[in-house]
């Protein structure tokens, strides 16, 4: 699974979801899906916009967490 650290980053930057949407040009709904870790996919342009607006690296925003195979 991939963990999205958007809520933590917004808290650290004291930035609202609305302000991030305005800074990135992304739809508020898209920001909310990422914030609540409900997004099913994300494109490179979105990642680039988020990293630029948050002044962070991709590794600050996402974390890969291996899952145990439950077969």
Question: What are these model-derived regions, one by one?
Answer:
Residues 1-15:
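A short, Lys/Arg-rich alpha-helix, primarily the initiator
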Residues 15-33:
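Short alpha-helical DNA-recognition segment
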Residues 7, 18, 48:
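Residues within the helices of the helix-turn-helix
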Residues 10, 35, 42, 65:
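DNA major-groove recognition helix of helix-turn-helix
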Residues 38-49:
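Short, basic-rich loop-to-helix N-cap that marks the start of a DNA-contacting helix
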Residues 10, 21, 51:
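The alpha-helix within a helix-turn-helix
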Residues 33, 62-71:
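Short, charged recognition helix plus adjacent turn
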């Amino acid at each position: 699974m991939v963990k999205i650290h958007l809520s933590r980053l917004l808290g650290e930057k004291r930035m609202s979801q609305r302000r991030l949407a305005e800074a990135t040009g992304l739809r508020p709904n898209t920001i909310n899906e990422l914030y609540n870790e409900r997004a099913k996919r994300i494109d490179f342009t979105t990642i680039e916009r988020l990293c630029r607006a948050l002044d962070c690296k991709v590794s600050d925003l996402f974390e890969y967490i291996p899952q145990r195979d439950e077969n």
